């Protein structure tokens, strides 16, 4: 897995649309594999469909040219995310979501030169206990918080970041629009930024 998120937006990503989605274009939606890597996720029977719906909404809303791409989402536990966080970021503690964009020096060229083969966008890992605790602490439905984190992780894979205030505002605004299209309230209304 790559170590860092790319800064800014890729040239292969289109401008954001308004939040009134039409039918989702399957040409924009990346093939997404959801892997349940920890038994604790069995308590959330709809987790896989929640993640898939969030990623489809994100890809459609930002009009991403990701239809020939693949990504994997690992639903794991705090121990799994802590190990990844320690290995790839040098931070020995769990977090809610990690994104590992695939190395793509020039994503636009990769989109054009794939010869029909899917391009790997990267991987997302989501920690059950942290997501559950945050949702409970913030009084949010678990599915809403999981949707937010799936969207957040996906946006990192396609080039969004929050290293600067300007980047954070762009990313958060995009997240709000995507989630509003899913009927999910502003996740930042009464809290600090996702980090």
UniProtKB/Swiss-Prot annotation:
Binds 1 zinc ion. Keywords: Cytoplasm, Endonuclease, Hydrolase, Metal-binding, Nuclease, Ribosome biogenesis, rRNA processing, Zinc. It comes from the Bacteria. Coiled coil: none annotated. GO terms for biological process: rRNA processing. PROSITE patterns: UPF0054. One of its GO terms (molecular function) is RNA endonuclease activity. InterPro entries: MetalPrtase_cat_dom_sf_prd, YbeY, YbeY_CS. Single strand-specific metallo-endoribonuclease involved in late-stage 70S ribosome quality control and in maturation of the 3' terminus of the 16S rRNA. Belongs to the endoribonuclease YbeY family. This is Endoribonuclease YbeY. It comes from Rhodopseudomonas palustris (strain BisB5).
């Amino acid at each position: 897995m790559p170590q860092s998120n790319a800064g800014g937006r890729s040239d292969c990503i289109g401008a954001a649309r308004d939040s009134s989605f039409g039918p989702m274009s399957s040409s924009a939606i990346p093939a997404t594999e959801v892997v349940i890597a920890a038994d604790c996720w069995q308590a959330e029977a709809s987790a896989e469909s929640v993640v898939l719906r969030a990623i489809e909404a994100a890809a459609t809303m930002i009009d991403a040219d990701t239809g020939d791409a693949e990504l994997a989402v690992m639903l794991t536990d705090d121990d799994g995310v802590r190990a990844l966080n320690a290995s790839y970021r040098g931070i020995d503690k769990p977090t809610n979501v990690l994104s590992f964009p695939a190395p793509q020096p020039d994503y636009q060229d990769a989109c054009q030169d794939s010869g029909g083969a899917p391009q790997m966008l990267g991987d997302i890992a989501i920690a059950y206990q942290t997501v559950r605790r945050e949702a409970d602490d913030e009084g949010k439905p678990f599915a809403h918080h999981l949707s937010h984190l799936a969207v957040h992780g996906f946006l990192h894979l396609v080039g969004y970041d929050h290293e600067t205030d300007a980047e954070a505002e762009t990313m958060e605004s995009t997240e709000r629009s995507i989630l509003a299209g899913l009927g999910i309230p502003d996740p930042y209304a009464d809290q600090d930024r996702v980090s």
